[in-house]
């Protein structure tokens, strides 16, 4: 599917971009693909990536998704786009909501418009569980990003750019996530700061995140949203699992929820579950393709919305302490930190 094709990853110097490159370099994809373009703002991270991967098919472009001209020029000749550029720290976005809008909404508008303008074949937009029933600025901005993608998908004709969305739960050990924080606190002999012990979060690995995007890339139709079924854990169990793994006796201190945090997250709303396709490891939420001429739907009838439960970190499979430890030990990041402990 990537033979002689050019792929662009926006925000490509982040955890997801590095995971994609690592996957491709370990497979035949790197032999098939024509070029991988990393589009991001940080020249230092791009230089680090060039040195780390050392592959002539990797090309780095300095630019900002907030600037349409820079993303449009970088997208010339691109076949596929994985749009990962985002502001994702919930408390930060609470203090700077317009910055979240500028990157997550207006930046996404620029990426999608540039993709359509450059006749890109397919775009996969990376979203978050916080976009479902959003209560914080980050989630609201990502929800609007999803709406932008679906609205543009609805207006595409057959043969035009296909736009799909993937929703993530918490990606373990990704940049800015809680696992690196806990490990750092353990190594420094500090208290482990837990916001709310009963708070639950979905647990996805970086491998899972790449799997989800590649699944959506291979199977997605116009306007589809894809969600990977994931287990969950309470924050307290996650912290205790890391204590056991690192043989730590650090005290745990409860500090209360931060700005904009939810007690649990949702990956699929109850309304979406009514029309979702269960694909064993994934849910596919097809686009509502109706137009604004609602009169014909009243005449023809429309399948009513079923009263189904939403898919949340409270009602998915809950991992116990040993299961969380087993999952954490599969992460390369945790293994590296253990070696350096």
Swiss-Prot record:
Enzyme Commission code: 5.1.3.2
Annotated keywords: Isomerase, Lipopolysaccharide biosynthesis
Annotated GO biological process: lipopolysaccharide biosynthetic process
InterPro entries hit by this protein: CapD_C, NAD(P)-bd_dom_sf, Polysac_CapD-like, Polysaccharide_Synthase-Rel
Molecular function GO labels: UDP-glucose 4-epimerase activity
One Pfam family here: Polysacc_synt_2
Catalytic activity: UDP-alpha-D-glucose = UDP-alpha-D-galactose
Function: Epimerizes UDP-galactose to UDP-glucose.
Family: Belongs to the polysaccharide synthase family.
Protein name: UDP-glucose 4-epimerase
Organism: Rickettsia massiliae (strain Mtu5)
Organism lineage: Bacteria, Pseudomonadati, Pseudomonadota, Alphaproteobacteria, Rickettsiales
Gene from which the chain derives: capD
């Amino acid at each position: 599917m990537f033979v002689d094709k050019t792929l662009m990853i926006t925000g490509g110097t982040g955890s997801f971009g590095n995971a994609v490159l690592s996957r491709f370099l370990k497979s035949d994809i790197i032999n098939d693909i024509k070029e991988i373009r990393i589009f991001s703002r940080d020249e230092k991270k791009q230089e680090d990536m060039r040195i780390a991967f050392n592959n002539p098919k990797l090309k780095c472009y300095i630019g900002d998704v907030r600037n349409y001209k820079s993303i449009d020029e970088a997208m010339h000749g691109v076949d596929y786009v994985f749009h990962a550029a985002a502001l994702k720290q919930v408390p930060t976005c609470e203090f700077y909501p317009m910055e979240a809008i500028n990157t997550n909404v207006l930046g996404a508008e620029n990426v999608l418009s540039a993709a359509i303008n450059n006749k890109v074949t397919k775009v996969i937009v990376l979203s978050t569980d916080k976009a479902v029933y959003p209560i914080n600025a980050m989630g609201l901005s990502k929800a609007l990003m999803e709406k932008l993608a679906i609205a543009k998908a609805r207006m595409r004709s057959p043969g035009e750019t296909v736009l799909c969305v993937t929703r993530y739960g918490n990606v373990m050990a990704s940049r800015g996530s809680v696992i690196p924080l806990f490990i750092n606190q353990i190594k420094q002999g500090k208290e482990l700061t837990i916001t709310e012990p009963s708070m639950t979060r979905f647990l996805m690995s970086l491998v899972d995140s790449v799997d989800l995007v590649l699944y959506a890339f291979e199977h997605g139709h116009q306007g589809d949203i894809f969600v990977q079924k994931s287990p969950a854990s309470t924050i307290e169990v996650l912290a205790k699992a890391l204590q056991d793994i690192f043989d730590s006796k650090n005290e745990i201190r409860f500090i209360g929820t931060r700005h904009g945090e939810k007690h649990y997250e949702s990956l699929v709303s109850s309304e979406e579950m009514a029309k979702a396709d269960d694909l064993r490891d994934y849910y596919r939420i097809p686009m509502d393709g109706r137009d604004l001429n609602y009169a014909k739907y009243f005449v023809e009838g429309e399948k009513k919305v079923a009263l189904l439960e939403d898919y949340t970190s409270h009602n998915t499979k809950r991992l116990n302490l040993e299961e969380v430890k087993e999952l954490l030990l599969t992460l390369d990041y945790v293994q590296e930190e253990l070696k350096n402990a």
